[in-house]
Amino acid sequence: MAKGEGHILAQNKKARHDYHIVETVEAGIVLTGTEIKSVRAARIQLKDGFAQIKNGEAWLVNVHIAPFEQGNIWNADPERTRKLLLKKREITHLANELKGSGMTLVPLKVYLKDGFAKVLIGLAKGKHEYDKRETIKRRDQERDIKKQMKHYNAR
């Protein structure tokens, strides 16, 4: 866990499988009252989400936050785009990295830090199919080695 990182509410495990993560940035999220209650209850899905930069602002798109059960009329649209809180130089740096390079911004995890919801955004480049197979093969080999070492040390 990174320094100062709190309770993890949601993780995007598929992102690390589908992308090479080049750089990570922590950002705050602008949420309504009922949305933060749903996030605290870990009712958030990052699977299809991504971030984009429009007009000098960062936005989180396609992240599903389930409606709060007791929220009734105050519930917002679960799929709405949400503003990300980043410093201006961070936004310009990310915008420069994204220009024409085949890179994208993916949310990696959502967690609470000092009572505020934060999202860890990864600057990522898509993996090819053979890269994914290679990652799976390497993981299986490491698992087999650990299993054999455990069996060997048990004697």
Swiss-Prot record:
Q: Where in the cell is it found?
A: Cytoplasm
Q: Which domain of life is it from?
A: Bacteria
Keywords annotated in UniProt: Cytoplasm, RNA-binding
A Gene Ontology biological process in which this protein takes part is: trans-translation
Biased-composition ranges for Basic and acidic residues? 135-147
Give the region (Disordered) as residue ranges.
135-155
Any Pfam family matching the protein: SmpB
Q: Tell me which GO cellular component terms the UniProt record holds.
A: cytosol
Q: Which GO terms describe its molecular function?
A: RNA binding
Q: Which PANTHER family does the entry link to? A: SSRA-BINDING PROTEIN, TMRNA-BINDING COMPONENT OF TRANS-TRANSLATION TAGGING COMPLEX
| HAMAP family on file | SmpB
What this protein is reported to do is described as:
Required for rescue of stalled ribosomes mediated by trans-translation. Binds to transfer-messenger RNA (tmRNA), required for stable association of tmRNA with ribosomes. tmRNA and SmpB together mimic tRNA shape, replacing the anticodon stem-loop with SmpB. tmRNA is encoded by the ssrA gene; the 2 termini fold to resemble tRNA(Ala) and it encodes a 'tag peptide', a short internal open reading frame. During trans-translation Ala-aminoacylated tmRNA acts like a tRNA, entering the A-site of stalled ribosomes, displacing the stalled mRNA.
| Similarity comment text for this entry | Belongs to the SmpB family.
What name is this protein filed under? Answer: SsrA-binding protein
Instruction: Report the source organism.
Output: Streptococcus pyogenes serotype M1
The gene for this chain is: smpB
